[in-house]
């Protein structure tokens, strides 16, 4: 596995902590959870989630939308995802958060 599993765990933990630090206290965000690089950002409703997903995709970030209420942004980057990529993703979510 050439260290990919440990790398995914390390970068995933970093990404979750940065998301919690930057947007975790937002009224639009209900929860941030996951394991490794599989992370879900639960939003207040599906409309807010759809808007955030569309804005992320317009910025070249591929994410999904899921959950029983369709209000979770699903992050599943490749195992080679780096800290720099995580920082870019967090910056984009911060910008989007300000517009929600």
Where are these regions (language model features)?
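Conserved N-terminal phosphate-binding loop of PLP-dependent enzymes in the Aspartate aminotransferase
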Residues: 1-100
